Amino acid sequence: MIIVKSEREIELMRRAGKITAAARALAGEMVKPGVTTQEIDRAVEHFIRKQGAVPSFLHFPGPPGVRAFPGSVCASVNDEIIHGIPGPRVLQEGDIVSIDVGAYIGGYHGDCAATFPCGKVSPEAQNLIDVTRQSFFEGIKFAKEGCRLYDISAAIQGYAESHGCSIVREYVGHGIGTEMHESPEIPNYGHPGRGPRLLRGMT
């Protein structure tokens, strides 16, 4: 079930979102040759806690038989696709690094991600970053009342594929609120006009 939030709930979510966005920006500034993903993780955790929030990802439970997530950020380098565990890996010139950050405050979560170039990257890597970012904004255009859920998915897929990129189909976006992962699941591919109709207050 997709939870529709009140204006007050969305204001509380904004607080978490602003902390999360600032933490992601800090992480992005640290993506430089010679820095480890663990150093980024520790700096982000310190920043989030300084704001009075708690890192959403730290000790997030995994599926049965998988240990809880050990970091405050997901740091995925080059061909790693999401949920990369921060550690002693030293970033190199030309790497691209996806940073995913979450913060919890006042009963609500914030969650955001972005991919950053480490120093000078290849034209192909920069194109991937640029197309991915714009695909996100193409999807956002349809995240409004009256659209269908898969209008978002189709816009992302259409832009990415029309610019020579492909879609990762094994992972999806998700709703958020008092829980880190709420309904609905939002794939990055699909047919427009399908899925639930979006209502004001869905997050």
Ranges and model annotations:
Residues 1-203:
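Active-site neighborhoods and metal-handling regions in enzymes and metal-associated proteins
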